[in-house]
Amino acid sequence: MCALLVGLTGCGPFLYAVDSIGAGSAVAQAETAGAADRAPYEYYAALSYLEKAREESGEGHYDAAIRYAQRAHDLGNRALTRAREAGTAGGERE
C-alpha cells in the first residue's frame, strides 16, 4: 500500500484527510470524557494542533498539515486517557 501511495501524485490531501479524521475523533472522544476539565493541557493542545492542521491544509501545505494532525491525534488520545484516569480516581464512572 505504501509503495502505491508513494507512486501517486497528489496523495497529500488523501493522507491528510485520513489523519485529520482520526485526530478529530480522538479530540471529540476526549471532550466527551471531560478532558477540558480533567486534562486541560493535552485537550487544548490537541485542539490547537487540529486547528493548525486545518489551516495548513487550506493553504495546500499537506506535509505540515499531516504532522499537525498526527500530533493532535496523539494529544487527543493522551487527553482521553488522562480524563478517564481522573474520572476513575475521583470515584466517577464512565
Predicted segments, located by residue:
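Short, charge-rich amphipathic alpha-helical segments embedded
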Residues: 63, 73-91
